[in-house]
Amino acid sequence: QVERCLWTVLESTRGKKPPRPDTSLEIAVAGSRPGAGATHLALAISRYLSGSGVESLYVEENQSGHMRCMAQTLGLRPDEAGIYHMAGCQVRPWYGETVTLKPTCPAVSVYDYGYEWKRMYGRGRDILIMAAGSSPWEQWDLERMLEALGPEIRSAKGSFLAFRGRKKGFAGFGSIGAEKKKYKEMEIIFQPYFEDPLKPGEQGEAFLRELWMAAVKSAGGKPMKRKERR
């Protein structure tokens, strides 16, 4: 299989800019249920990358209409490619599957599936991030998503399960330990609380930096000194 992403990767030290992909990387984010935080996390990732010098495009792949609502509230208008520019973040809302838009070639595309994780079947994204709550009543939704997305978890270059608002050491409830053994390709991460995805604060920035470096490593990157892009 031909690799889709070739990388020039920076050393993962604090204060340095994140690595830049030589070709486009696709990141898919989905939540186990409404309120799991998929949109929050997808926006935060896209804003972090754009703010760090990596061209990123947030793509709304769910039918919630949240992005157009936010753009209207902020009084924004889309450009010729249907993209809104929000606080340094490029956002393309859901226009439907029959609408043809001007093609774009960002370094990273972040696809937000919301809780419509079934739409991810067969999409073949490079990096898969699954957002989940950690309350006991959310367990069944999480198990259902993991079971259904098994092929995607195994075929992605990198797969992550992000628990919302939990510290390291939390292992989930019920069968999560067993699921982790079942999906050895999946890494469990812990997302700190930050209210605004476009302003995650110092703790949020550190989390996003760590997540991005892990994604780069999963996609085949190697720590090396910075080189000028050709």
Q: What are the functions of these language-model segments?
A:
Residues 2-6, 97-99, 142-149, 204-207, ...:
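Generic hydrophobic alpha-helical segments
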Residues 25-36, 55-124, 189, 193-202:
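P-loop/Walker-type NTP enzyme "switch/lid" segment
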Residues 1-26:
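Extreme N-terminal, non-catalytic leader segments
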Residues 4, 105-202:
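Conserved catalytic-core segment of NTP-binding enzymes
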Residues 46, 50:
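Gly/Ala-rich phosphate-binding loop of Rossmann-like dinucleotide-binding domains
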Residues 9-13, 52, 152, 218, ...:
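Solvent-exposed amphipathic alpha-helical surface segments
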Residues 199-230:
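NTP-binding/hydrolysis catalytic cores, primarily Walker-type P-loop NTPases
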Residues 41:
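Hydrophobic positions on the alpha1 helix immediately C-terminal to the Walker A/P-loop
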